[in-house]
Amino acid sequence: MTVTTFSELELDESLLEALQDKGFTRPTAIQAAAIPPALDGRDVLGSAPTGTGKTAAYLLPALQHLLDFPRKKSGPPRILILTPTRELAMQVSDHARELAKHTHLDIATITGGVAYMNHAEVFSENQDIVVATTGRLLQYIKEENFDCRAVETLILDEADRMLDMGFAQDIEHIAGETRWRKQTLLFSATLEGDAIQDFAERLLEDPVEVSANPSTRERKKIHQWYYRADDLEHKTALLVHLLKQPEATRSIVFVRKRERVHELANWLREAGINNCYLEGEMVQGKRNEAIKRLTEGRVNVLVATDVAARGIDIPDVSHVFNFDMPRSGDTYLHRIGRTARAGRKGTAISLVEAHDHLLLGKVGRYIEEPIKARVIDELRPKTRAPSEKQTGKPSKKVLAKRAEKKKAKEKEKPRVKKRHRDTKNIGKRRKPSGTGVPPQTTEE
């Protein structure tokens, strides 16, 4: 049965009221897939890119469990949520408080960059849900300041990024401390690769695997097209022109490498476009300042790599620009999911050089719809567009040449004469007489 409304999920009235306050009536694909098995107490292995409602997909069943089975007296946390970054932990906590605002449930946050005294209340007062980063939480566990024995559900958000950041051992240590738990939910942007699958096998027991990309209806809120660029200079000129348009009120520009982040940020500043940037090696204070500048409207352009932008939620993004084309359809969906949130519409623009056309075709096939081209009159490309039939497969001419080379190599090989009696089944295996190999002798 397909779930079309939140009321069909048999959620508590207080949660339905909170969803209504936020304007949410229909569950997204990942919510419809993940919430029912989670409510049944099953372990869940979920995959969904940013912008698909992944956070509510695990928060709603966790909150419902606490309401269905209230404890008689106060105690340590019953739900533990682990995130890779402080920003994501704060966002998840805020989201949980919004969903729990008509209940009496308590939510606390434990992250790095915060003095111990600020976490003292978490240890001394009743907490139902704790959202934490692994490093700081593990420190408190080792100091015996945090009690994991009451944790009933362990939730891992952005698990793939936690692995990328080298937190696998820390998470497994924490999972060991919560070994009395009844349920584990693991969510990731992608489930591709042996690392995430092996990790999930070690932590989850007979999980229900759910995967949901944005539906066609959700993607239609995002206008997608591309501009063809002759070279890097032309591509930068296109980006500058598009960022200066009045409709680009808040934009994220994605690049593939950290080095390009600094280059592009400087080029945009030279063109009169004030911007901020995020890259993997930034200290926490600078990351917070960059995000604050963007959300407060002091700048309206953020340049970022995929890894650096993971785990941050920036509201009201009007445009997403792929300055460097992503190498996978998953990454493309993850990027464009930054816009068109909360029922709004958004725009995703890709800037494509000749060598990017194969990636463009790959993305189009993945999302099962072609991305259409547009042209700016004063910045028309001067080079010819690659053939639309270009697929990345070798042409017939190339295949014919390869076949000829293969035949030539076979002709060069010396032919060994085979006699019929050498190939007959004659019982005990022996060397064919035509090999010219002398019999072995043993020395006494």
Swiss-Prot record:
This is ATP-dependent RNA helicase SrmB. Belongs to the DEAD box helicase family. SrmB subfamily. ATP binds at A48, P49, T50, G51, T52, G53, K54, T55. PANTHER family: ATP-DEPENDENT RNA HELICASE RHLE-RELATED, ATP-DEPENDENT RNA HELICASE SRMB. A motif (Q motif) lies at residues 4-32. One of its GO terms (biological process) is ribosomal large subunit assembly. One of its GO terms (cellular component) is cytosol. A motif (DEAD box) lies at residues 157-160. The lineage of its organism: Bacteria, Pseudomonadati, Pseudomonadota, Gammaproteobacteria, Enterobacterales. Interacts with the 50S ribosomal subunit. Forms a complex with the 50S ribosomal proteins L4 and L24, and a region near the 5'-end of 23S rRNA. Pfam families: DEAD (PF00270), Helicase_C (PF00271). Disruption phenotype: Cells lacking this gene grow very poorly at 20 degrees Celsius, show a severe deficit of free 50S ribosomal subunits and accumulate an abnormal large ribosomal subunit. Disruption also impairs the processing of both 23S and 16S rRNAs. It catalyses: ATP + H2O = ADP + phosphate + H(+). Its EC number is 3.6.4.13. The keyword Transcription does not apply. PROSITE patterns: DEAD_ATP_HELICASE, HELICASE_ATP_BIND_1, HELICASE_CTER, Q_MOTIF. Overexpression suppresses a mutant defective in 50S ribosomal subunit assembly. Residues 238-387 form the Helicase C-terminal domain. Keywords: ATP-binding, Cytoplasm, Helicase, Hydrolase, Nucleotide-binding, Ribosome biogenesis, RNA-binding. DEAD-box RNA helicase involved in the assembly of the 50S ribosomal subunit at low temperature. Exhibits RNA-stimulated ATP hydrolysis and RNA unwinding activity. Acts before DeaD. HAMAP family: DEAD_helicase_SrmB.
